[in-house]
Amino acid sequence: MTGTPASRGSLTHEPDRFSDPAWELLLAGQDMARRWRHDQLDVEHLIQVLFSDSSFRRWVEPLPLRSDDLLDRLEDVLADQPPARGDQLFIGEDLEQLLETADQVRGRWGDRSIDVPQLIVAVGADPRIGAELFAAQGLAVDRLESLLRQPSVSPAPAPPPVPTAASAPAPTPRSAPAPRVMAPEPEPMVELEREPSALEAYGRDLTEEAEAGSLDPVIGRDSEIRNLIKVLSRRSKNNPVLIGEPGVGKTAIAELLAQRIVAGEVPDSLQGLRLIALDLGALIAGAKFRGQFEERLRSVLEEVSRSDSGVVLFIDELHTVVGSDRSSTDAGSLLKPALARGDLRCIGATTPEEYRRTVEKDPALNRRFQQVLIREPDLELSLEILRGLRERYELHHGVTITDEAIQTANRLADRYISDRCLPDKAIDLIDEAAAQLKIEVTSKPQVVEEAEADLRRVELALLAAEEAPEEERIQLQRQRLEVSSRLDDLRRRWQEERTQLEELGQLLQQDEDLRHAIAEAEREGALEEAARLQYDQLHTVQQRREALEASQAEAQSAGTALLREQVEAGDIADLVARWTGIPVQRLLAGERRKLLALESHLSERVIGQVEAVAAVAAAIRRARAGMKDPRRPVGSFLFLGPTGVGKTELAKALATSLFDEEEALVRLDMSEFMERNASARLIGAPPGYVGYEEGGQLTEAVRRRPYAVLLLDEVEKAHPDVFNLLLQVLDDGRLTDSQGLTVDFRHTVVVMTSNLASPVILEHARSGSSDDAQLQQQVDAALSSQFRPEFLNRIDEVIRFRPLKVKDLVRIVRLQLADLSTLMAEQGLSLEVDDAVADSLARQGHEPEYGARPLRRVLRRQLENPLATQLLEERFRSAHGIRVRCGTDDGASLEFEPLE
């Protein structure tokens, strides 16, 4: 059996030839064919609808047929048919013949249109399947026709007897049709469902959604919407394309245009327009054969051009349509003729990068569009947008969002989330914080769970005390009564607060519905109705809402509330901390105090470098106070000095002080980048080379953690090409990797260490000279011989580290001994060390040219190794501590005594 598309002469192209029930039967058969995933509508689909659909079963119930047996046989036939290979539905040849037979039956019966009984008779006459199914149950076509065509009797006082099939009269000539009654009488039919148009199937009517009030309010953006309206009002090139980074509000501007069209706040040339957003998911989904995607897009464009009411097509993510490459024909070739003829008015939206990649490479398509740049809003405008959206998110989540939370989200999103744009990233913060609070509100409060645990504990104790003294049991029973009473009170308060929150959510919804009804009444000119809604119902709702919010605020301030219904600044800070790994909670409240005490925090770990610590702290404070170029890193430092004097340790301490964890230190050993080709690893391998998709070691590390201390250790060993890359980082605070992605270094502290000029610094320290100017000249000469001037000029501070003295090493020894005491305390032993021990170890480890590293070896050799041996020998088994003192012979060796 083959299927062909319905021809021009097919009865399916003449719906007027059918009655409403008969046409609905054909439509239901079409749905049945799609349900079976068949690409051909045929007789068996109509039969299954007749016997399985309650809307049509009344037509066949009087017939002597067993529906279950017939449907079982029919499902076997339908299951054997192959599945569809495309989206088109064909009309089977057998169904075409059935419709012709039904038309002949209509002619014999003298009816004006084909009705369901004629279709059933034609099914019984179908030679392939219908006649077989009916004949298997003893129902021939002649009897079928006689059952369905029963004449009525002239009006009489009493109803006539129902004629049998044997007494049915012969067919009446067409010229004199006899009146008849079809059994059973169908119920009144509803209006037939029609197939959705291309715009309905593949688009969203934004103006309809704006009229229904389902679009979010759009605040500000006056200049952008004016530019958009000006381009749409032009005679030619009236197709704007909104170009902006992700999250700046391109789609929101299109929604704002729809809202202004509905409100009548557009020029006369745009009044009454429909703004349809193209649904790319529906347009592309299922287009698995060549040309299907373009065919769907062409049907949309044709319907837009035929529209009398005026349609503007909004194509969000324009590059996915133009650069879809779904087949050999680019969709841009379909847009260009329609745009050139003026049949299509289109608003596109895309990012600058995608616009360059897809649209600008086609000059013919590019000149059809007029660019409208959408820039990221500043903090002030972003704050206004967030405040305008507050009610929508409060309504959705059923919680209250404080203004402090909105300001915090706006500020922290701008400062700590650098890979996205405002207001989108701030909206995400508010949305997720509100969702998290909603989950907490709907969950059981912790105080209730603790009371339930206390009750279970007391009840278990009471069960275990069956043989205990009577006084103890009475005490436990009294405790159970107290805990149970407290738990009942907590549960009652919890339920009351939940009821209040639910009522508040309902009031928020009523407030939103009333505002929409007022706006609609004002648009329609029903000013009395609008006034009644505003000053009667809305006023009542707002009064009740204010009373509930005041009651909840009072309970919160008194500390008696079990549930928290307000999103606060701390919630936003917690969320930013989880997203970025930055301890924003501490920065939120105590950053000023921390910055003012930065020297003391750094000096606890970095010993003997007072000048270096002070210089770093001053530079960080200047940056945090806003006295630096906002495009540059927080600070850039070059640490110079001998090895082991604390250069790397200061970078670690800085990471801990600023970001509360040493993991915020991104460390790169620049000795790994001594060769020219190795420098490419910082930003990633070029296209075509191994490792291109992995990204660069420097750019990927900073992209994952933009708030960090970047330590470039032994920077003088790097290839000169590395410094060319660092120029952009130090000056512009950004670096573009091999994949074209820009990495932000504005929130990074760049620290470079070098051993350059170490001999000069050591010699100056040995000589005891106080001529610091001469030393500075020698250091500058050493730097100039290694680094180019443009690199040195971009560094904020070049900081010298002086060699360590014995008194500095004594302080370092005491820090190391404090760490060792902590380890010994875990074994239950205290550690007491004489002051002479620290002095002795410091003198033994003092080697100015090597810094503090020899001291680590002395500690290990003189203290840790012998102490470990004696611990394993269990010399201190009965002691509670160990005392360490210098030996009596030469003072260089140490002695260990147990403390009883």
Swiss-Prot record:
Residues 804-900 are annotated as: C-terminal. Residues 91-154 are annotated as: Repeat 2. ATP 2 binds at residues 641-648. Residues 591-803 are annotated as: NBD2. Residues 18-81 are annotated as: Repeat 1. Keywords: ATP-binding, Chaperone, Coiled coil, Cytoplasm, Nucleotide-binding, Repeat, Stress response. Gene3D superfamilies: 1.10.8.60, Clp, N-terminal domain, P-loop containing nucleotide triphosphate hydrolases. One of its GO terms (molecular function) is ATP binding. One of its GO terms (biological process) is cellular response to heat. It is found in: Cytoplasm. Residues 15-154 form the Clp R domain. PANTHER family: ATP-DEPENDENT CLP PROTEASE, HEAT SHOCK PROTEIN 104. This is Chaperone protein ClpB 2. It comes from Parasynechococcus marenigrum (strain WH8102). The gene is clpB2.
